[in-house]
Amino acid sequence: MHSQIWVVSTLLISIVLIVLTIVKFKFHPFLALLLASFFVGTMMGMGPLDMVNAIESGIGGTLGFLAAVIGLGTILGKMMEVSGAAERIGLTLQRCRWLSVDVIMVLVGLICGITLFVEVGVVLLIPLAFSIAKKTNTSLLKLAIPLCTALMAVHCVVPPHPAALYVANKLGADIGSVIVYGLLVGLMASLIGGPLFLKFLGQRLPFKPVPTEFADLKVRDEKTLPSLGATLFTILLPIALMLVKTIAELNMARESGLYILVEFIGNPITAMFIAVFVAYYVLGIRQHMSMGTMLTHTENGFGSIANILLIIGAGGAFNAILKSSSLADTLAVILSNMHMHPILLAWLVALILHAAVGSATVAMMGATAIVAPMLPLYPDISPEIIAIAIGSGAIGCTIVTDSLFWLVKQYCGATLNETFKYYTTATFIASVVALAGTFLLSFII
């Protein structure tokens, strides 16, 4: 049995190893996580074959569920992108004269972000911000910051986004419940971290016009876009199916045939599978796309997820090593003796890891590995709440280590100092608000 000092030192060194190899030596996170897994296994006295078996089972067990859902989600997001469905939502909300432009951008980010990776969402939706900025003579920062904050919030707390789905799966949380809680917390965090924060700044927020190099980026002709009803139906269908499953689990007899049917169609894999074929028809065939064209778009979409799948698989390996080496059990005892609330601990670990590594996905996987062992010691706190707490932490501290920081800086034509002052601060405020929302939810449910 290893001493607590040895266990804590091993864990801390493994985290430092991950950060250094990614930030300093430019290792891919997949390799960094695998290296840390071998390091922990060796330091905890695992045999070579035991380490390999744990890594293999960790990768397989994690991707066995997530690979299918992420793949199907990628198709759904790609169809949203190529059909112009995301722009349809933005243009429709733009007509709501009772909403301010910054609130509109939050809603666009939240709704469209459900099916889009955060970086893809920024690239796809920023022309809408450009268009509104030109028409209303508004500072681009007032539009881009709420949009990007909302996209980041959804990315971290709402499945079927890969990191949020990974955390929910590893903690044994109900995915439908996490979706509902995540949307509530994400909306509150985005509105306060975006529009309310910018309103507080007032005239101190500098005016930023659309950068000249992006002046030619335009929103597509509205006549070529799918209808709003078709767009919303496609986005919300898989979420609705998963929520029906959650409701059924609370209210239906488990022996009934209807319950089995609802469990089947509400499973994330089945729900996303159904949604993909609805998207093919509603956003593809009805928009005069051929099956060959949709096949090409699907293949192009799959090319972009190899990176995230490998990172998530390696995160599963790291998690498996922590469990197999008994480090997780000892860590649970140590953390419980710290007398720090598990919600605060989950948030803080994810926040620090995001700042250090620059990837919200890696941060959430690392936080899950650290926090999960102590959950059995707190039966009154649901895994859904801890999942939201981890995601809330990962929203914050979007700094120079994160590619999203540079994307926002480039599109807004902002200086490094301005991006720190306005966007990094916005994400940190959103993260703190999300933490407060998570605590509030924990008292209610």
Swiss-Prot record:
Keywords: Amino-acid transport, Cell inner membrane, Cell membrane, Membrane, Transmembrane, Transmembrane helix, Transport. Residues 26-28, 78-105, 161-177, 245-257, 323-342 are periplasmic. Its main location: membrane. GO terms for molecular function: D-serine transmembrane transporter activity; gluconate transmembrane transporter activity. It holds the Pfam family GntP_permease. It is found in: Cell inner membrane. One of its GO terms (biological process) is D-serine transmembrane transport. Induction: By growth in D-serine, controlled by DsdC. One of its GO terms (cellular component) is plasma membrane. It is a multi-pass membrane protein. It comes from the Bacteria. A D-serine-specific transporter, may function as a H(+) symporter. PANTHER family: D-SERINE TRANSPORTER DSDX, GNT FAMILY GLUCONATE TRANSPORTER. Belongs to the GntP permease family. This is D-serine transporter DsdX. It comes from Escherichia coli (strain K12). The lineage of its organism: Bacteria, Pseudomonadati, Pseudomonadota, Gammaproteobacteria, Enterobacterales.
